[in-house]
């Protein structure tokens, strides 16, 4: 079987240039250090491929296996791992320094929905003009905001003044 690898991560069959290789059989047994030509013959007899698993080792470690099946299983594992990853979005809720209580309630309900959905929430109080002199009001607003949703979220990054915004990041509570 003459397969030349399309997958550039592995060196297969005739692409192996070293004189001697350490060979692992298709059943996982150690066959020892043998010449590459002999290892290729062993692989051909079993109608399998000789794949360099760690080409940088001295001598390189090669395994006799079905390369097509191996690549298929690798891609299948990668897809499975990708499927299991959870992408966490950061949603932003903007408040002003002079926000009314009812508006805070509405914004906190939106943030609650985001946290329940598993997203992080960035809460920003925006200061205009001289309002930055009264940053303590922004901290009060953020504390009040957090009190309304502390049953579904935790503070990941506490309130901090960054430029003209006071920002706090909330994360969903672990169940």
UniProtKB/Swiss-Prot annotation:
GO cellular component: cytosol; membrane
Alphabetically ordered keywords of this record: Cytoplasm, Initiation factor, Protein biosynthesis
Disulfide bond sites: none
First-listed, main subcellular location of the protein, grouped into a coarse class: cytoplasm
Family as reported in the entry's similarity comment: Belongs to the IF-3 family.
HAMAP family on file: IF_3 (MF_00080)
Protein name: Translation initiation factor IF-3
């Amino acid at each position: 079987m003459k397969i030349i690898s399309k997958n550039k991560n592995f060196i297969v069959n005739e692409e192996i240039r070293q004189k001697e290789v350490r060979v692992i059989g298709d059943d996982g047994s150690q066959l020892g250090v043998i010449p590459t030509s002999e290892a290729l013959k062993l692989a051909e007899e079993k109608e399998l491929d000789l794949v360099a698993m760690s080409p940088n080792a001295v001598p390189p470690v090669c395994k006799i296996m079905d390369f097509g099946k191996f690549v298929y299983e690798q891609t299948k594992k990668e897809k499975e791992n990708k499927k299991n990853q959870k992408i966490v979005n950061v949603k932003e809720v903007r408040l002003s320094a002079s926000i009314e209580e009812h508006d805070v309630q509405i914004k906190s309900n939106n943030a609650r929905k985001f946290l329940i959905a598993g997203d992080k929430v960035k809460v920003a109080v925006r200061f205009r003009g001289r309002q930055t002199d009264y940053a303590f009001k922004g901290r009060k607003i953020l504390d009040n905001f957090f009190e309304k949703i502390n049953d579904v979220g935790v503070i990941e990054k506490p309130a901090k003044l960054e430029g003209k915004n006071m920002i706090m990041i909330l994360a969903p509570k672990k169940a």
